[in-house]
A protein has these predicted regions:
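Extended ligand-binding regions for polar small-molecule ligands
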Residues: 31, 74-83, 143, 150, ...
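Ligand-binding clefts/hinges and TM-proximal coupling segments of bilobed small-molecule sensing domains
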Residues: 32-38, 164-187, 227-228, 261-296
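Extracytoplasmic small-molecule ligand-binding "clamshell" domains
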Residues: 36-113, 259, 279
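Bilobed "Venus flytrap"/periplasmic-binding protein-like clamshell domains
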Residues: 51-59, 69-82, 134-192, 212-214
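Acidic, polar ligand-binding/catalytic clefts
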Residues: 78, 82, 87-151, 233-237
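Short helix-initiation/N-cap motifs at beta->coil->alpha
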Residues: 89-100, 144, 183-202
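A ligand-binding cleft/hinge motif common to bilobed small-molecule-binding domains
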Residues: 97, 114-122, 167-175, 206-241
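Periplasmic-binding protein-like
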Residues: 131-139, 222-262, 283-296
């Protein structure tokens, strides 16, 4: 699970350039409405499909099961399309350049797991959040030496290099030290989170810092190996800036973004979203419908 792809971190310039060509130049047959004006719900119904672009490599949000895209996001989009009376046209693309393809009207929505940032919100309509991406810590199951995030002094902590979780982890260590505590014995970074979790399982590190949703999924799949560090009430302890996960729609396509938001709201109210969260992450999460876009 390559978290930095999802939450706005930079990649190499050459990779971005190649992916932009793939997303913009090579998808002329994939796309949504080529009209110069805003895309309307009537046009989507006339087309008979909602075209959604993602990178199906981020389990459990979206990933390939044989030749089909499945996951948490896929389940939500399937319900949205059912309610709209259209087919779900899912496109699997490299993540870099995927937003450029949205601007070029090659598809209707970017339904990848996007972290909500001020920069993205200035360019696109970011839908209501569908998950929590704030940084949490995972320890080995039964490690009683870590009862809360205040017990991390002297511990080895791992995370993925060049992602916002690394920044949050460094800042939390600085907070511990500013309070007169020792702080981590070591902060190690890895090329991927699966590598970090393998090191945790093998006892080479004591904690892994990653976004909440992904950690919940890891713990659900490996309940005998890992657990999230929680407070006395059993609630996950989070550090850093609140980070929410949502999707991107073109600014001018207000009918579509309003419809998607109304569906997310409905799924929250009728319990559908909670059921899907429990299915894919093991537990339900409270999600905001306002004040979820960070300040500049």
């Amino acid at each position: 699970m390559k978290n930095e792809r999802r939450f706005g971190m930079l990649r190499k310039v050459c990779a971005m350039a190649v992916a932009s060509v793939l997303a913009v130049g090579c998808l002329t047959a994939c796309g949504s409405s080529k009209n110069s004006g805003p895309l309307t719900l009537d046009q989507i119904k006339e087309n008979g499909k909602l075209t959604v672009a993602t990178e199906a490599a981020y389990e459990p949000f979206e990933y390939m099961d044989g030749d089909k895209i499945v996951g948490y996001n896929a389940d939500i989009f399937a319900k949205i399309c059912d309610d709209l009376g259209v087919e779900l046209d899912y496109i699997d693309l490299p993540f870099q350049g995927i937003l450029a393809g949205l601007e070029a009207k090659k598809y209707d929505v970017v339904g990848a797991t996007l972290g909500v940032t001020a920069e993205r919100a200035s360019k696109y309509t970011m839908t209501y959040p569908i998950q929590n991406g704030t940084t949490v810590f995972v320890k080995r199951k039964g490690d009683d030496s870590i009862k809360s995030i205040e017990d991390m002094s002297g511990k080895k902590v791992g995370t993925q290099t060049s992602c916002y979780n690394e920044d949050d982890t460094k800042k939390f260590n600085e907070k511990l030290q500013s309070e007169g505590k020792e702080g981590y014995s070591e902060l190690l970074t890895y090329d991927s989170f699966p590598e970090a979790f393998a090191e945790l399982k093998n006892g080479k590190i004591d904690l892994v810092a990653q976004n909440y949703a992904s950690c919940a999924a890891v713990v659900m799949k490996n309940p005998d190996d890992y657990e999230i560090v929680c407070d006395d009430s059993g609630k996950a302890e989070m550090v850093g800036t609140d980070t929410w996960v949502s999707w991107a729609v073109r600014k001018e396509d207000t009918e579509l973004s309003d419809y998607i938001n109304s569906e997310i709201h409905k799924f929250k109210e009728d319990g559908t979203l909670a059921e899907l969260q429990k299915k894919w992450f093991g537990e339900a999460t409270d999600l905001p419908e306002s004040d979820y876009i960070p300040a500049e």
